[in-house]
């Protein structure tokens, strides 16, 4: 039986290990669950393993905000204490406090 445990939790702020963006976790897949086309678009020498958690992030960088799908190996915790400036954060979470966002109601 396949078992995995996510390192990061819903509402946690994380940043990408290699690229200049950060975000708040709003969903987690136990293993890769996107399209083959999405995966194949990643340069072969940078492709993450599929058998690890993948995180859905409400992400931001210096220019914009967006939704990102990132493997666990490419994330690190963000300890900046700064909230994420994404317009959809309030749809999922309560006010930013103590470095994370509490869940807003029930998520499916």
PLM regions and their residue ranges:
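Intrinsically disordered, low-complexity, charged/polar segments
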Residues: 46-108
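Intrinsically disordered, low-complexity boundary segments flanking structured domains
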Residues: 12, 41-46
């Amino acid at each position: 039986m396949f078992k995995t445990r996510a390192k990061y939790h819903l509402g946690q702020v994380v940043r990408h290990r290699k690229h200049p963006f950060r975000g708040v976790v709003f969903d987690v897949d136990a293993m890769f669950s996107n399209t083959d086309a999405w995966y194949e678009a990643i340069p072969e020498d940078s492709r993450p393993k599929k058998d690890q958690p993948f995180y859905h992030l409400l992400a931001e960088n210096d220019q914009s905000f967006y939704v990102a799908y990132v493997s666990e190996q490419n994330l690190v915790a963000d300890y900046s204490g700064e909230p994420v400036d994404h317009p959809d954060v309030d749809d999922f979470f309560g006010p930013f406090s103590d470095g994370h966002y509490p869940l807003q109601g029930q998520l499916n």
